[in-house]
């Protein structure tokens, strides 16, 4: 369904890089991390090809009853063979998805690479009627 998931966040001097890693792993498990020091901040990236990579998002979207909102953000971030969404870093650390990426610490960016974005969106965040998936 997807080829790769990449997650990226900027880590500022006031932040603990291990906590940012935890926030990222709370959304996408099995990430392999790399850090790039840019002086004033670190760019932390994690990548995975694990088949279970999107299972946690799948569960969070349903558990938080945000399928319609998630679908809207997935469609908005759909570009060719990539779907890009941005989520709040602090909410992710708490194990919650919040699409309000406005934060002084910056968002966590999730890039899903897929040859079939429509199928992926239909699985991850199907359209609903009265909160019940209809796809």
Curated annotation (Swiss-Prot):
Regarding protein family, the annotation reads: Belongs to the UPF0201 family.
Q: Which InterPro entries match?
A: PAB1135-like (IPR002739), Ribosomal_uL5_dom_sf (IPR022803)
**Pfam (any one):** RNA_binding
Name of protein: UPF0201 protein TON_1346
The record's listing under SUPFAM superfamilies reads: RL5-like
The protein's organism comes out as Thermococcus onnurineus (strain NA1)
Recite the lineage of the species: Archaea, Methanobacteriati, Methanobacteriota, Thermococci, Thermococcales
């Amino acid at each position: 369904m997807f080829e790769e998931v990449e997650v990226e966040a900027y880590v500022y001097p006031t932040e603990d890089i291990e906590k940012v890693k935890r926030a990222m792993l709370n959304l996408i498990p099995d990430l392999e991390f790399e850090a790039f020091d840019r002086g004033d901040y670190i760019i932390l990236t994690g990548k995975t090809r694990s088949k279970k990579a999107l299972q946690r998002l799948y569960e969070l979207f349903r558990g938080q009853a945000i399928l319609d909102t998630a679908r809207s953000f997935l469609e908005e971030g759909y570009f060719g063979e990539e779907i890009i969404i941005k989520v709040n870093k602090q909410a992710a650390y708490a194990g919650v998805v919040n699409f309000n990426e406005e934060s002084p610490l910056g968002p966590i960016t999730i890039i899903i690479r897929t040859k079939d974005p429509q199928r992926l969106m239909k699985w991850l965040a199907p359209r609903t009627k009265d909160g019940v998936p209809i796809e």
